[in-house]
Amino acid sequence: MTKVGLRIDVDTLRGTREGVPRLLATLHRHGVQASFFFSVGPDNMGRHLWRLIKPRFLWKMLRSNAASLYGWDILLAGTAWPGKNIGNANAGIIRETATYHETGLHAWDHHAWQTHSGHWSIRQLEEDIARGITALEAIIGKPVTCSAAAGWRADGRVVRAKEPFNLRYNSDCRGTTLFRPLLMPGQTGTPQIPVTLPTWDEVIGPAVQAQSFNTWIISRMLQDKGTPVYTIHAEVEGIVHQPLFEDLLVRARDAGITFCPLGELLPASPESLPLGQIVRGHIPGREGWLGCQQAVSAS
């Protein structure tokens, strides 16, 4: 049996309102638990449209047929009007999710984090994280124990900024296996659970067709030599491609794959995890930099 961590990112108002309830119903039908990471502040995702002037982002939008995939309400959110507060508008849905699934913070403002966190100071990072955690805890009525950086925009500064919040783990980068981030010689931070597998929007196109994606990604899960972690998005697999995701759950089960919340991947003694650090890097299919796992020597 292959155990795969299932991470569900919720970036937008529509993803929370429409995608999450459908995902909850789908997961319940198949007896699967996952980790949900919510954006809880304003939905300003439409402000990413200016990035269309960048060839790699434009190609990604065309390759994934973004208008059909996400819908114009997502693509224009926060452009001609102020972005609506996601958490306030969907508190009941978020609370229901936290009743049945591991629930953590994705971002206060997903667009702001993805656009500006790379040059924010440690203090600005801490203030933004605190704002999101405070809002999410007020909604779910219990402490937030995990987080996942929006757009995988993370580096050593983000790792340090999250330390005061005493989280059980973070999932801030792409990599191969769980690790303890090295803060300074002799001092490590909160365990990191990297995403190891590509997302739908990173690979769909000439190389991988939509109808063959499930076969392709299951093959990647079974071949993963580290600790497999797969990310879906409420805006994609919870809305337009919900039938495809349900088919994935069936096929994965038949292939001997069991999905689980990311927290279940942590060992009893996190001190046994290897050391590592998060550095800025790039991966195929995703525009811009993102956090990538890098091994470091124990010496």
From Swiss-Prot:
The reactions it catalyses are:
4-deoxy-4-formamido-alpha-L-arabinopyranosyl di-trans,octa-cis-undecaprenyl phosphate + H2O = 4-amino-4-deoxy-alpha-L-arabinopyranosyl di-trans,octa-cis-undecaprenyl phosphate + formate
Q: Which domain of life is it from?
A: Bacteria
Identification of the protein by name? Probable 4-deoxy-4-formamido-L-arabinose-phosphoundecaprenol deformylase ArnD
What GO cellular component is one of the record's annotations?
membrane
- Can you supply a Gene Ontology BP term from the record? 4-amino-4-deoxy-alpha-L-arabinopyranosyl undecaprenyl phosphate biosynthetic process
Organism per entry: Salmonella paratyphi A (strain AKU_12601)
Which Pfam families does this chain map to? Polysacc_deac_1
GO molecular function terms here?
hydrolase activity, acting on carbon-nitrogen (but not peptide) bonds, in linear amides
Task: Please explain the role this protein plays, according to its UniProt record.
Answer: Catalyzes the deformylation of 4-deoxy-4-formamido-L-arabinose-phosphoundecaprenol to 4-amino-4-deoxy-L-arabinose-phosphoundecaprenol. The modified arabinose is attached to lipid A and is required for resistance to polymyxin and cationic antimicrobial peptides.
InterPro entries named in the record: ArnD, Glyco_hydro/deAcase_b/a-brl, NODB_dom, Polysacc_deacetylase_ArnD
Q: Which PROSITE patterns match?
A: NODB
Report keywords, A-Z.
Antibiotic resistance, Hydrolase, Lipid A biosynthesis, Lipid biosynthesis, Lipid metabolism, Lipopolysaccharide biosynthesis
Residues forming the NodB homology domain are 2-260
| Family to which this protein belongs | Belongs to the polysaccharide deacetylase family. ArnD deformylase subfamily.
Record's keyword annotation contains Hydrolase: yes
In which pathway does this enzyme or protein participate?
Glycolipid biosynthesis; 4-amino-4-deoxy-alpha-L-arabinose undecaprenyl phosphate biosynthesis; 4-amino-4-deoxy-alpha-L-arabinose undecaprenyl phosphate from UDP-4-deoxy-4-formamido-beta-L-arabinose and undecaprenyl phosphate: step 2/2; Bacterial outer membrane biogenesis; lipopolysaccharide biosynthesis
